[in-house]
Amino acid sequence: MDETKTPTRDEIPETDKWDLSHLFSSADKWSEDFAWIQSTYPRLTTWKGRAGESVRTLAELLEFDKALDLKIERVSHYASLQLAEDSANPDYLSRMGQLQNLFTKIGETASFIVPEIQAIDDESFARFLDDPALKKWRTRLQKIRRLKPHVLSEKEERLLALGSSALDGYDDTFSQLTDVDMKFGVLLDEKGEERPLTQSSFGAFLVKRDHGLRKSAFHKFYDEFKDHQFTLAATLSYSVKADVFRARARNYNSALEASLFKDDIPVAVYDGLIAAVRANLAPLHRYYELRRRVLGLEELHAYDTYVPLVAEIETDVSFDQAMEKVLASLAPLGGEYVDSLGKGLRGRWCDRYESKGKRSGAFSSGSYGAPPYILMNYKRDVFSDVYTLAHEAGHSMHTWLAQRTQLYQEADYPIFLAEVASTFNEELLTHYLLEQTNDSKMRAYIINRQIDDIRGTLFRQTMFAEFEKVIHALEESGAALTLEVFKTEYRKLLAAYFGSGVMLDPELELECLRIPHFYNAFYVYKYSTGVSAAIALAERVLSGVPGAVEAYLGFLKSGGTKFPLETLQAAGVDMRTSAPVESTLRLFERRLNELEDLL
């Protein structure tokens, strides 16, 4: 096989592909389950108008809905994994299209379940919860019930549903404008060859060692945003207005409170994150000064903050070697964890290598009762792919242990917890790799990587989180959200987080208009809390705190049985305090000290 060309799927050895037979032994078996779902889901209407009739009736409805969901999850998982391995395969595209049409119909048919559970009177609901027949559904029923104060009348809910497309349209407008309509042109790379500048390639230009190329990419990229800045300000403004409207319509005190309510996160946790990071910006500013000095620049600009301080190290690590490094790094978690992961990786949980039509990047996904699967595009000369494997393995083991321990209805964990397990694995890998090498260049590379990870997930995402809070508060106060308001508020944050050692080009103010996550408000703070919780948990395990390993494994196994803060507290980390964030900030400063000594 010519290694300079991307192989076709058929050219990849079977042992290097994931084994989807755990889901379905054949496409025909998938079709059988799909047909069963098609013929069975209409039976949901048998319970319409009757959910609160009796304990027995509600239990029957929940069990039937569960049986349906298990089938739906599995057929969906199989189809999505096949499409990920070859996005051009017409059979795979057809299956996914069939599913999407069916899901719409099922969603409409099942839409009565939650409102009817919320409509059960308080006395009857309390009696239902105490009945042994509903014991295994208690957590789910309580989570549904706690939303009751924020659910409106049937007529009002219908009006909100009818308006949802209009309220959500700003996200689509933003995506179409930035991904399709905006054209960024081409740049001459370091070899003098023309390269397209796009949303996806912009980041690749910023890590180039050629300062002039980074500068050109930055200005050319933001010139296009400047041409559309008023439109982008309008779409963001109306997205914020939609958030505030929904929060007020559902009787929340603020859009922030509305977003945090589902996971039972107090606003004080969000505010505490911002306060803790704000109070510890000095080491970040020191890091930028180190960057300026090491890169040999008279002044540092934002486009100089992504290029690695240590040039990409030459490496040749096979997938099997990467797997062994990851497994060795996870030894502190004990045999149950390491043996299960090793057996899974050797047993074709992972689709290892790039092939034509395969989805780029990496992910982990699972469905109840089957192994989790990992998509990789592993390259033996890209050292960061070892980290990617550790990261995705963390997600997979979280899913694996939760599903093997909990009932279906309690196994799924929220996004707030999802990044904890994956980042935890990266922390253990970093610790292991630093223990295994005395090579100063390799140590500097690993430490610089960890510093930049913390910078990107804790400092940068907290800055974004603060911006979201500011602009929603302005809207709630009645202030107009204009282009100048967005740029002014964002520049204040840039000045605080970058410090006086970074030259702030005027174009950088436009960065606030290009962040897709701002159209899914108050999401990004979860990256900051996730990395903080992961580092705090990893430090407990690595320092040998009694019971830390058992507590961490208990966290992985708990799934969605409790709300996120309770789950993490049981594992030994209290996110209601600033301690985990401050622990991560101290690690950042320790690593910075080490990097300064090495460089």
For the regions a language model picked out, list residue spans one by one.
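Short pre-active-site segment immediately N-terminal to the catalytic Zn-binding motif
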Residues: 315-317, 369, 373-390
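Catalytic zinc-binding patch centered on the HExxH motif and its immediate surroundings
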Residues: 315-317, 350-370
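A well-structured
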Residues: 1-312, 323, 598
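Post-HEXXH active-site segment of zinc metalloproteases
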Residues: 385-388, 399-423
